[in-house]
């Protein structure tokens, strides 16, 4: 953790909010035009994806706030808890990279790898919480830290869910464009 990195996350989230507003306004205006069936599907899919990307940025702020609270209260995870959260963080970085790369490059093969990773992250989330409860019962972790761990895990899980949504929108759009024709 560093203040510079935390501020960078906050600055980027503020930019994402501005981009979200502008892109959503543009796509909404565009959707009111006389679009082809294909273009209409693409605009709708983009609107959903943009919303999910914006929500991911909101969760990044929540993560920063949790880490800042840990520093302020001088709380640290146990060695095992830190290892688990580092693994969880690496999985989240992986799913974010896959999702953004798939979206930017319209890479369907990469998009197909997101959902299986999201399911692994779901299991990792359950394991982290279960292991934390064991440490709590053994007195190896505090209740305050447990609440922060729960907040971090929830935000990580939601980031993974939004990544999954984006990948699914991409795959559904491709399927609709391949297998559906507009009504006469």
Set out the residue ranges of the language-model regions.
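Cytosolic, long alpha-helical scaffolding segments
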Residues: 1-181
């Amino acid at each position: 953790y560093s203040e510079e990195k935390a501020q960078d996350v906050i600055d980027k989230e503020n930019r994402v909010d501005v981009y979200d507003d502008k892109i959503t306004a543009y796509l909404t205006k565009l959707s009111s035009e006389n679009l082809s069936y294909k273009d209409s599907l693409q605009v709708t899919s983009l609107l959903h994806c943009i919303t999910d990307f914006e929500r991911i940025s909101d969760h990044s702020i929540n993560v920063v706030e949790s880490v800042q609270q840990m520093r302020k209260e001088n709380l640290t995870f146990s060695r095992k808890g830190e290892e688990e959260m580092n693994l969880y963080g690496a999985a989240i970085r992986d799913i974010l990279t896959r999702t953004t790369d798939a979206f930017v490059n319209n890479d369907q093969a990469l998009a197909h790898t997101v959902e299986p990773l999201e399911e692994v992250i779901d299991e990792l989330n359950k394991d982290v919480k279960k292991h934390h409860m064991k440490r709590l019962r053994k007195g190896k972790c505090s209740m305050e830290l447990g609440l922060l761990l729960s907040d971090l895990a929830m935000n990580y899980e939601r980031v993974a869910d939004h990544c999954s949504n984006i990948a699914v929108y991409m795959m559904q759009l491709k399927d609709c464009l391949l297998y559906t024709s507009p009504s006469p």
